[in-house]
Amino acid sequence: MKPQLLGFHHIAIIASNYTRSKHFYMEILGAKQLNETYRAERDSYKLDLSFPDGSQIELFSFPNPPPRVTTPEACGLRHLAFKVENIDEYVAYLLGKEVSCEPIRVDELTGMKYTFFRDPDYLPIELYENNY
């Protein structure tokens, strides 16, 4: 019998400015802190964040991380997507927090609304309206 994957446990993100990214994910996006660890030997932090559905983000800081490759179609993680109940309401909230969002579009395959914005390190983040 083939073993089964149960789903995603976490996404790991390396921040160029730990304090700014911690504020963004917790204060703007509403993630809850599970644990924060400072590792002196690495001069780095690891912050475990959680969302209501149990999904998690591990936010890391390192003294001199290399910059992110900006080509959006390069191999690797393309974007992070969050599901929301009302995309119009969430976009209005983000705009009120001075977070720029692309215009809301409709997925031609599913008929669901979606949009993109960026985190403090320009990681593309998608909002996807979840009506089911």
Placement of each model-derived feature along the sequence:
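Mid-chain, well-packed structural core segment of small domains
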Residues: 80-87
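A short, acidic/glycine-rich surface segment
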Residues: 34-36, 43-44, 64-70, 103
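N-terminal beta-strand motif that seeds the catalytic metal site of vicinal oxygen chelate
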Residues: 1-19, 77-80, 131
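Short, charged/polar surface micro-motifs in flexible loops or helix N-caps
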Residues: 52-56, 64-65, 87
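Vicinal oxygen chelate
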Residues: 1-4, 37, 48, 91-132
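Exposed loop/turn and edge beta-strand positions of beta-sandwich/beta-sheet ligand-binding modules
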Residues: 7, 43-45, 76, 111
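Helix-adjacent hinge/juxtasegments
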Residues: 59-60, 70-74, 78
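Core segments of cupin and vicinal oxygen chelate
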Residues: 13-56
